Amino acid sequence: MQPSPPPTELVPSERAVVLLSCALSALGSGLLVATHALWPDLRSRARRLLLFLSLADLLSAASYFYGVLQNFAGPSWDCVLQGALSTFANTSSFFWTVAIALYLYLSIVRAARGPRTDRLLWAFHVVSWGVPLVITVAAVALKKIGYDASDVSVGWCWIDLEAKDHVLWMLLTGKLWEMLAYVLLPLLYLLVRKHINRAHTALSEYRPILSQEHRLLRHSSMADKKLVLIPLIFIGLRVWSTVRFVLTLCGSPAVQTPVLVVLHGIGNTFQGGANCIMFVLCTRAVRTRLFSLCCCCCSSQPPTKSPAGTPKAPAPSKPGESQESQGTPGELPST
């Protein structure tokens, strides 16, 4: 039996980059949860699914942060605990990501409405929380989670490479669902985009007002960009983990390449940050309210005093000015 290769060593700069990625992902996931709590009128079914994805990403970022901070050098109880939490959260994140794409496909292309979508949401909960939980509990009970020498991770613990069937458990605890998502996400979003483009083409023949048509095209263009970017961002983040997984199976020393290690660390930990960029910072309805909230917090300072010592009175507002400055929630586009 050949001796196992030395573990992948992480230099402080690599750990710092991955820790920063974990922190930004946790911040982004927390911001998504906060926007859901602050504005009830924005709680559509799709954004409700995004809330559960954000919770999974938040737990994933926290568990990865602990793993990278500890940089485990061998098996221990907290290595198993961290590996179990990250396995559950990471697998759940895969399921919720596909669930959002499937929901958009069924609601837009198949026009699913009413009780049917309610049953669908319950099914998403059962699958997206239940399946990862069963897999994780089984992996812990069978002692499959443990130290992996950072060959298929970046400092954190996952599947014990000493287990005889470690490849099977790597597939069950993440890689199988990851590779299925590579196929399902582009396929579902492509079908949704084709349906939307077909509908816009049909509607354009009956829109005589050019300004409305221009606004429709502008909003649909932003939606089309998102439908393309969502699967591309997911694949762009996760592919480095898959590459190192394949290199580990092949026994290639390239698995320890520093650039590949850093990309793997960022890709596995930054999903929450990427979702925040897409669905908060690049969604005008949420971005406008968030910036307004920040401006209100910054402007809520005590009134300045005039040289005479009396506080300056605020300038009287013009009639109708306050109504013009406040847009109704329904007027804010979701793109």
Curated annotation (Swiss-Prot):
Isomerase in keyword set: no
Gene Ontology CC: one annotated term: ciliary membrane
Annotated region (Disordered), positions in chain: 300-335
Alphabetic keyword roster: Cell membrane, Cell projection, Developmental protein, Differentiation, G-protein coupled receptor, Membrane, Receptor, Transducer, Transmembrane, Transmembrane helix
Protein name: G-protein coupled receptor 157
Gene3D superfamilies: Rhodopsin 7-helix transmembrane proteins
Species in which this protein is naturally found: Homo sapiens (Human)
TM stretches of this protein: 16-36, 49-69, 88-108, 120-140, 167-187, 227-247, 259-279
Bias type Polar residues, positions: 320-335
Predominant place of localization: membrane
Gene Ontology molecular function: G protein-coupled receptor activity
Signal peptide: none
Compartments reported by the entry: Cell projection, Cilium membrane
Gene behind the chain: GPR157
Extracellular side: 1-15, 70-87, 141-166, 248-258
Family stated for the protein in its record: Belongs to the G-protein coupled receptor 2 family.
